[in-house]
Swiss-Prot record:
Disulfide bonds join 96-188. GO terms for cellular component: plasma membrane. CDD domains: 7tmA_OR2T-like. Glycans are attached at residues 5, 88. GO terms for biological process: detection of chemical stimulus involved in sensory perception of smell. The chain crosses the membrane at residues 25-48, 57-78, 100-119, 139-157, 195-218, 236-258, 272-291. Keywords: Cell membrane, Disulfide bond, G-protein coupled receptor, Glycoprotein, Membrane, Olfaction, Receptor, Sensory transduction, Transducer, Transmembrane, Transmembrane helix. It holds the Pfam family 7tm_4. The lineage of its organism: Eukaryota, Metazoa, Chordata, Craniata, Vertebrata. Belongs to the G-protein coupled receptor 1 family. The gene is OR2L3. It comes from Homo sapiens (Human). This is Olfactory receptor 2L3. Residues 1-24, 79-99, 158-194, 259-271 are extracellular.
Length: 312
């Protein structure tokens, strides 16, 4: 029996799990994915921190991606699981605002960080002699800090808006987290101006970075094609294909969800797509980056040997 215990300012998250065996199966699957994401991303962060061979700009950026993914999935899944287990789907007005802020901030930061990672590979392959200068430690810190700051400013603007608009009597959000577009549908006012702002924000944080990434890899693939070393060509192709896989998994569902007009959107479809970028992508990223990556596997072997020999 579901217990909402709703006050006048609470929201209700209708959730993702149906009240059936299918819902229980999906719950177990999501929790498993969550645990895999925690283990994978924590392992990647520790591995890059502990092994000096991975103290390069590429892996420094990768460690930040794992940190974002770790926080990203932790913002969504614990509340999602708690609602299913307790049957209490209510979330306070403030709690909804906090969840919405962190989701938007982390999502924006990750989109910009993926563009920074593409720039790193572009410089490494197309301008190898300039790489130590263009991708210095200071530049990496600026990229990461900039991603967090810009993502947070964007999230703050969206969160302040949804916390100050008047809501109708129904406060049931047809989603499993406080997604801003899902909250806006409950507003007792015309929100077409804001929907245009969401479109613009999505274009800035997703479309423009994706175009930049595509252009970077176009140049990279051209440079790789002219490489004389077969081994170097293979390594470059592997690195680029890995990053492009991650970019596709992250950007595609986001763009499809947020660039469509409200009239063409389905709450059920939005929730299914949201599972991809809130749970599956954070779980898959460390697997994709470590699979067939000799440097990561070599670092894992070295760190494991140090742990076993007690030299940590």
């Amino acid at each position: 029996m579901e217990n909402y215990n709703q006050t006048s300012t609470d929201f209700i998250l209708l959730g993702f799990f149906p009240p059936s065996r299918i819902g229980l199966f999906l719950f177990i699957l999501i929790v498993f994915i969550f645990l895999m994401a925690l283990i994978g991303n924590l392992s990647m962060i520790l591995l890059i921190f502990l092994d000096t061979h991975l103290h390069t700009p590429m892996y420094f950026l990768l460690s930040q991606l794992s940190l974002i993914d770790l926080n990203y999935i932790s913002t969504i899944v614990p509340k999602m699981a708690s609602d299913f287990l307790s049957g209490n789907k209510s979330i306070s007005f403030t709690g909804c605002g906090i969840q919405s802020f962190f989701f938007s901030a982390l999502g924006g930061a990750e989109a910009l960080l993926l563009a920074s990672m593409a720039y790193d590979r572009y410089i490494a392959i197309c301008f190898p002699l300039h790489y130590p200068i263009r991708m210095s430690k200071r530049m990496c810190v600026l990229m990461i800090t900039g991603s967090w700051i810009i993502g947070s400013i964007n999230a703050c603007a969206h969160t302040v808006y949804v916390l100050h608009i008047p809501y109708c009597q129904s406060r049931a959000i047809n989603h499993f987290f406080c997604d801003v577009p899902a909250m806006v549908t409950l507003a007792c006012m015309d929100t077409w101006v804001y929907e245009g702002t969401v479109f613009l924000s999505t274009t800035i944080f997703l479309v423009f970075p994706f175009i930049a990434i595509s252009c970077s890899y176009g140049r990279v693939l051209l440079a790789v094609y002219h490489m004389k070393s077969a081994e170097g060509r293979k390594k470059a192709y592997l690195t680029c294909s890995t990053h492009l896989t991650v970019v596709t998994f992250y950007y595609a569902p986001f763009v499809y969800t947020y660039l469509r007009p409200r009239s063409l959107r389905s709450p059920t479809e939005d929730k299914v797509l949201a599972v991809f970028y809130t749970t599956l992508t954070p779980m898959l990223n460390p697997i994709i980056y470590s699979l067939r990556n000799k440097e990561v596997m070599g670092a894992l072997t070295r760190v494991s040997q140090r742990i076993c020999s007690g030299k940590m």
